[in-house]
């Protein structure tokens, strides 16, 4: 079973946001051929908290829109086959304040921006990155393909 553990540190998250992200990431999981027995967490925070996380864990003292912590990122390959435990992908942290600002700046809905950020974080958990131009092209192309196939367009 694909499990997403949500946490709202803002007190402002609407139930519809949980449903949207859950449905989108379930769709993305299938598109990326991730096994059903996987889990991750999504946490909603404000600007102050995401800046603190960014400073503490990434040594960047600034506000950002989304941060991902992939559990498998720096770990050597561990074979869990045959064990009845889910694959833990990691954590996605989304700043809802920045999501709203970016939606306004880009001229699309908050829901589209929230979906974009959740998917962006999810792809990072799967190993996608945008440190090089080629990696960025691959990751952003994949994001656009999944968002468009899901029906969450820039319009």
Swiss-Prot record:
Lineage: Bacteria, Bacillati, Bacillota, Bacilli, Bacillales
Binding site for Zn(2+): 120, 124, 130
Subcellular location per the Swiss-Prot or TrEMBL entry: Cytoplasm
Cellular component annotations (GO), alphabetically ordered: cytoplasm
Cofactor: how and how many bound: Binds 1 zinc ion.
Keyword Transcription regulation: no
Cofactor: Zn(2+)
Keywords assigned: Cytoplasm, Endonuclease, Hydrolase, Metal-binding, Nuclease, Ribosome biogenesis, rRNA processing, Zinc
Name of the protein: Endoribonuclease YbeY
MF terms (GO), sorted A to Z: metalloendopeptidase activity; RNA endonuclease activity; zinc ion binding
Residue ranges of coiled coil: none
EC number assigned by the record: 3.1.-.-
InterPro entries assigned: MetalPrtase_cat_dom_sf_prd, YbeY, YbeY_CS
One GO BP: rRNA processing
Protein family according to the UniProt entry: Belongs to the endoribonuclease YbeY family.
PROSITE patterns per UniProt: UPF0054 (PS01306)
Main location group: cytoplasm
Organism name: Staphylococcus aureus (strain Mu50 / ATCC 700699)
Function: Single strand-specific metallo-endoribonuclease involved in late-stage 70S ribosome quality control and in maturation of the 3' terminus of the 16S rRNA.
Pfam families, A to Z: YbeY
